[in-house]
Regions:
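Conserved GHKL (Bergerat-fold) ATPase module
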Residues: 1-220
Length: 220
């Protein structure tokens, strides 16, 4: 926990830890933490990820942008021996290694989160509560992973109460002959949940997704 706090600059406990070593053409070791609490500046337009880059255990920079913006809440370190110790900022940005690290680290995080959702639904629900609105930015920013990200997404619905529903959950509960996913978008979750527009759907027992995050108007 102390190491996490020194890396993340936070005082909570990590909600999840991801540790792996990549070998082959590009070799590096990565240790990533998903914080247990939401940083106060999570939605700051200028906020960037803070993955610390090390070369042979020597700190180089925390501005290499090793994750996409929608994973900017993740904290951690990457250590590699495949760069020189005197590497310049320009060399870092132009290095094929950095692109490989970004792709590998992003893919690993996005593959570990569904496993966590299966193994510990409560822990994943907390992560989604804190960071779901940011992760959903990837639904319209990350074309490469647009087929993967919807499986991560969780939603409030007219049937979920205070809980979260996945699209898989929603599909499993479709009414007979229902072929569409219904949703309502607005600025306030409570207001759209009580919208008169939903009365007909409730009367027919049709579940509706309640989309109230700022990003929802962009990706639906």
């Amino acid at each position: 926990a102390d190491f996490y706090r020194s890396v993340a600059g936070q005082y909570d406990e990590p909600a999840a830890t991801i540790h792996f070593r990549a070998e082959g053409l590009h070799e590096y070791t990565a240790l990533a933490f998903i914080p247990g609490a939401r940083p106060f500046d999570l939605f700051d337009a200028d906020r960037k990820g803070r993955i610390k880059l090390y070369v042979k255990r020597v700190f180089i920079t925390d501005e290499a942008e090793l994750l996409p913006r929608y994973l900017r809440f993740v904290r951690g370190i990457v250590d590699t021996a495949d760069l020189p110790l005197n590497v310049s900022r320009e060399m870092i940005q132009d290095s094929p290694l950095l692109g490989a690290i970004k792709k590998g680290l992003t893919n690993r995080i996005l593959s570990e989160l569904p496993k966590l959702a299966q193994q510990d639904a409560g822990a994943f629900a907390t992560i989604w509560e804190n960071f779901g609105a940011v992760i959903k930015e990837g639904l319209y920013e990350d074309f490469e992973r647009r087929a993967q990200l919807p499986d991560l997404a969780r939603f409030r619905t007219t049937a979920s109460g205070e809980g979260w529903r996945s699209l898989k959950d929603y599909a499993a509960a479709l009414k007979e002959n229902q072929t569409a996913i219904y949703y309502i978008v607005g600025d306030d979750a409570g207001r759209i949940a009580n919208s008169p527009q939903l009365e007909g759907f409730r009367a027919r027992g049709i579940e509706v997704l309640l989309l109230s995050d700022p990003v929802d108007g962009f990706w639906v």
